[in-house]
Curated annotation (Swiss-Prot):
Tree of life domain: Bacteria
GO cellular component: cytosol
Domain PUA: 294-372
One example GO MF annotation: glutamate 5-kinase activity
Key word Amino-acid biosynthesis present: yes
Protein name as annotated: Glutamate 5-kinase
Organism taxonomic ancestry: Bacteria, Pseudomonadati, Pseudomonadota, Gammaproteobacteria, Oceanospirillales
Biological processes annotated in GO: L-proline biosynthetic process
Length: 386
């Protein structure tokens, strides 16, 4: 099993080197790694994780944790030996267990002088545009403040099933939400193998591949184990979801000593799945190809010059007029005074708000609206020139 496969014309050492440079990681830790065989939290193990997470933070990595374990902790607190089958009982266990889960994370991070925050998400939070933007704004603010967000699904209020589908998918969506550079999925396997390593002694670990390489499909779907390769296809699917925003994914064994800090150092651990494009390229291409625009902004010559020559954000002061019934977060087109479309992007204000602040300096937005979402009408990260 020491043999490592490299699929396609990829250089693993070069690909791994990026882990030493990137600054925002979403790290998913599953129940098998956080609990004592599904019966309550493994506090010593959590302490070791936090030691590594704190070391990453000191090294300049912004960490977001997607944590399982609420149901298992709830079962322990309620004295239940078997996982319940009824949805309302699962939700009750999650509600009880979430208290202990968050307290445990908080206590461990407190040893390193770090603040934590609990974020509970549902599918609707990430499918509704306004709620998505609110969640993104809150998370990015917490990250900028140096707080470690602890994210889980809001199991107590979901109505269709107890889980998002799986926390791998949730972690990938969170990686897209916060525009993470890397998604780290910690599992009880060493990574993705070309064959089931439990029944094939000649199985080889895939060291690096493109996330969308179809050759991986058969490797990930050949077993039905609940915690092993049976869950590997969901991890592959999560890596493909994360790759849409340009994030690379590492699927790696969570019980490897100092696994997170060693990944940061570029050690060849686990399976590295690469996106087809860099994060900023993927986002800009998505913006350029987003055909359905909801409104139109006409810019003065100064704003056009700042956007095209300096790559700056679009401020309200540079906008001459607003047309359309768009809402915050929707796509709008930007035109110069001659009627040429020069850019498009995701707007930070509803149309009725934008009408009130066009031509106004950003520091006056709050006095006009009574609040301020952002100083920019369109942030440069959400803007693409045409």
């Amino acid at each position: 099993m020491s043999v490592r496969l490299q699929l396609g014309q990829l250089n693993e050492s070069q690909a791994r080197a990026r882990l030493r440079e990137t600054r925002r990681w979403v790290i998913k830790i599953g129940s098998a790694l956080l609990t004592n065989d599904g019966r309550g939290l493994a506090l010593d193990a959590m302490g070791l994780w936090v030691d590594q997470l704190a070391a990453l933070r000191k090294d300049g990595v912004e960490v977001v944790i997607v944590s399982s374990g609420a149901v298992a902790e709830g079962m322990s607190r309620l004295g239940w030996r078997e996982r319940p089958k009824l949805l309302d009982e699962l939700q009750a266990a999650a509600a009880v267990g979430q208290m202990g889960l968050v307290q445990a994370w908080e206590a461990q991070f407190k040893r390193h002088g770090m603040q934590t925050a609990q974020i509970l998400l549902t599918h609707e939070d990430l499918s509704d545009r306004k709620r998505y933007l609110n969640a993104r704004g809150a998370l990015c603010t917490l990250i900028d403040m140096g707080v470690a967000p602890i994210i889980n699904e809001n199991d107590t209020v979901v109505t269709d099933e107890i889980r998002f589908g799986d926390n791998d998918t949730l972690a990938a969506l969170v990686a897209n939400l916060v525009e993470a550079d890397h998604l780290i999925i910690l599992t009880d396997q060493s990574g993705l193998f070309d064959k089931d390593p439990r029944s094939n002694t000649d199985a080889c670990l895939v060291g690096v591949a493109k996330a969308n390489d179809t050759a991986l499909d058969s490797m990930a779907s050949g077993s039905s184990g609940a915690l092993g390769r049976g869950g590997m296809f969901t991890k592959l699917r999560a890596s493909r979801l994360a790759s849409r925003s340009g994030a690379a994914t590492v699927i790696v064994g969570g019980r490897i000593d100092s696994v997170l800090t060693r990944l940061r150092n570029g050690d060849e651990l686990g399976t590295l799945l690469l996106p087809d494009q860099e994060r900023w390229v993927a986002r800009k291409q998505w913006l350029a190809g987003h055909l359905k625009t909801r409104g139109r902004l006409v810019l003065d010559d100064g704003a056009v010059r700042v956007l095209t020559q300096q790559g700056r954000s679009l401020l309200p002061v540079g906008v001459k007029s607003v047309d359309g019934g768009f809402q915050r977060g929707e796509m709008v087109s930007c035109y110069d005074l001659q009627g040429n479309e020069v850019a498009r992007g995701l707007v930070n204000y509803d149309a009725d708000e934008a009408v009130r602040i066009v031509g106004v300096a950003s520091e006056k937005i709050e006095s006009i609206l009574g609040y301020i979402n952002e100083p920019e009408l369109i942030h440069r990260d959400n803007l693409v020139m045409l």
